């Protein structure tokens, strides 16, 4: 399963790290490997292991049918709202730890997710990386 992370600060880099360190246990849980295909950020990260995954245009993620899960870790209402709304409209599951976004636009984004039959999840980011865990669990059918 392909995923994308929007924002590569403390929480975004933590999400990438959690998937890297715990990739095999997460794969067992969801029934397939979870791979970060893109990391959206304004900055470049020369020498960082994710440098080849950096994109600067959120539409690259929204328009890629392989990406099923998007983790928003940018913070603030804008541009997070515009980006998250585009992901939901594109039929992607989204999770965020962005309290400002959820407080101001949560009801609208929940309704859009329901309309598009995808999940919009929000939870506290206790230790960078936690926001992706529930989404992976919920977005995949139970494996026996």
Name every feature range the model reports, one short phrase each.
Residues 13, 77-78, 103-104, 129-130:
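Loop/helix-junction capping segments adjacent to catalytic residues or to phosphate/diphosphate-binding pockets
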Residues 134-144:
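Residue-level detector of conserved catalytic or cofactor/ligand-binding positions
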Residues 16-17, 50-51, 106-109, 131-135:
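Short acidic, glycine/serine/threonine-rich loops at helix termini
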Residues 86, 99-126, 133:
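Rossmann-fold NAD(P)-binding glycine/threonine-rich loop
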Residues 1-89:
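N-terminal glycine-/serine-/threonine-rich beta1-alpha1-beta2 phosphate-ribose binding loop
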Residues 6, 72-74, 97, 104, ...:
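Structural motif
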Residues 93-94:
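A short hydrophobic/small-residue beta-strand
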Residues 20-24, 114-118, 139:
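Generic secondary-structure signature for well-ordered alpha-helical cores
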């Amino acid at each position: 399963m392909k995923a994308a992370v929007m924002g590569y600060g403390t929480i975004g880099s933590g999400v990438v790290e959690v998937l890297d360190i715990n990739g095999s246990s997460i794969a067992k849980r969801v029934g397939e490997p979870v791979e970060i295909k893109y990391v959206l950020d304004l900055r470049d990260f020369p020498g960082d292991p994710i440098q080849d995954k950096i994109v600067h245009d959120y539409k690259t993620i929204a328009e890629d049918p392989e990406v099923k899960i998007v983790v928003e870790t940018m913070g603030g209402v804008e541009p997070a709202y515009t980006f998250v709304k585009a992901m939901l409209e594109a039929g992607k599951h989204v999770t965020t730890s962005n309290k400002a976004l959820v407080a101001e636009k949560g009801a609208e984004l929940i309704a859009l997710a329901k309309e598009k039959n995808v999940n919009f999840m929000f939870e506290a980011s206790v230790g960078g990386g936690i926001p992706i865990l529930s989404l992976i669990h919920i977005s995949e059918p139970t494996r026996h």
